Amino acid sequence: MSLEAIRYDEKNHTLTILDQLRLPHESEYVPINNSDDGWKAIKDMVVRGAPAIAIVAILSLAVELVHGGKVSRDQTRAEVGSFISDRLDYLNTSRPTAVNLSDAVGSFKKLVQTQTGSASELIEAFLSASHKMLLDDVQDNKNIGKYGLEWIQKNVPQAANGHKISALTICNTGSLATAGYGTALGIIRALHEAGVLERVYALETRPYNQGSRLTAYELVHDGIPATLVTDSMAAALLRKNKDIGVIIVGADRVVLNGDTANKIGTFQLSILANHFDRKFIVAAPTTSIDVQTKSGEDIEIEERPAIELTQVKGVDANKQPLTVSVAAPGIEVWNPAFDYAPYKLIDAIVTEKGVAEKTGGEFNLKEFKSAN
């Protein structure tokens, strides 16, 4: 059974999330009581992963509409609609790179604008749509796993010849980054379930260590054969291990031409895949495809605090929280959270609707998205 990082009680409208800052040493669920809690959880990376961020943001507002005390079904529809729209705009400021959040905000603002009826009916419509968003994400991820498995079995030589393959991945793209199952890690789960996976190699993903803290946690939990490596070992690993047939990454934003923003380090993996002639695929829901942004150069890249690079958090021998400084005091730091893989180095983009591939060396994601 895969992990459940988001727990939403539809009947009582309560939300708790697994505190990912405490993983892998502690598994603690924290309550999200309103949109302020949601914003802080996203900003502080208590929850992370583009799909999960959007889901927690919307559900945090759903909880607030029921329990927050700032809005009432006795108010006018205009007052409730204005409150929801203002809170959505606020939530959208928590993390700017992930398109899922801005898309969800836009979708729910449209619901506010188009839903007719009373304030109570508007609140009910919001609650229903937010719960559906949670349920749909799990099924979407399983579909991504299915389509990714099929593509790999046809296009990765070892798998096409009936042999097991190994895969390389970065960051965390599993149940901890989504409503469940995962995107890139969902494909890896599908490979494992089908008996196709020999081993997955997970990059530690500095400086926040989502690979060593979160992906490794999921892989151990699910009993998937896995090996953890540092980010700087990727080239040596690919040169040594010929059985690694595919690199699978997630996406925070896929733009019109196919350039894909993802965790810092993704760009170098796309270069390595090209150099070593390995397949490089992106796993993302269609909600992560942003056809309004033309290329990777137009993506706003979030920069994180310097302290995330100069200090490391963990626990001591007694499992007490511990923060250790690992850099020379006074050193300047550049700490972008993301980079982007250019579309020319991407073999396929796997979504819940199917697989987008290049024709004549170009992706046509506008047509792909509209057709699906």
From Swiss-Prot:
Reactions it catalyzes: 5-(methylsulfanyl)-alpha-D-ribose 1-phosphate = 5-(methylsulfanyl)-D-ribulose 1-phosphate
Site (Transition state stabilizer): 171
Pfam families per record: IF-2B (PF01008)
Enzyme class: isomerase
Predominant location category: cytoplasm
EC numbers: 5.3.1.23
Organism from which the protein derives: Yarrowia lipolytica (strain CLIB 122 / E 150)
Source organism phylogeny: Eukaryota, Fungi, Dikarya, Ascomycota, Saccharomycotina
Annotated family: Belongs to the eIF-2B alpha/beta/delta subunits family. MtnA subfamily.
Gene3D superfamilies xrefs: translation initiation factor eif-2b, domain 1, Translation initiation factor eif-2b, domain 2
Keywords attached to this entry: Amino-acid biosynthesis, Cytoplasm, Isomerase, Methionine biosynthesis, Nucleus
Function according to Swiss-Prot or TrEMBL: Catalyzes the interconversion of methylthioribose-1-phosphate (MTR-1-P) into methylthioribulose-1-phosphate (MTRu-1-P).
One GO molecular-function entry: S-methyl-5-thioribose-1-phosphate isomerase activity
Compartments it resides in: Cytoplasm; Nucleus
Single biological process term from Gene Ontology: L-methionine salvage from methylthioadenosine
NCBIfam families per the UniProt record, alphabetical: eIF-2B_rel, PRK05720.1, salvage_mtnA
Nucleus among keywords: yes
Domain of life: Eukaryota
An example Gene Ontology CC term for this record: cytoplasm
Protein known as: Methylthioribose-1-phosphate isomerase
Active site per the UniProt annotation: 252
Pathway: Amino-acid biosynthesis; L-methionine biosynthesis via salvage pathway; L-methionine from S-methyl-5-thio-alpha-D-ribose 1-phosphate: step 1/6
SUPFAM superfamilies according to UniProt: NagB/RpiA/CoA transferase-like
UniProt key word Isomerase: yes
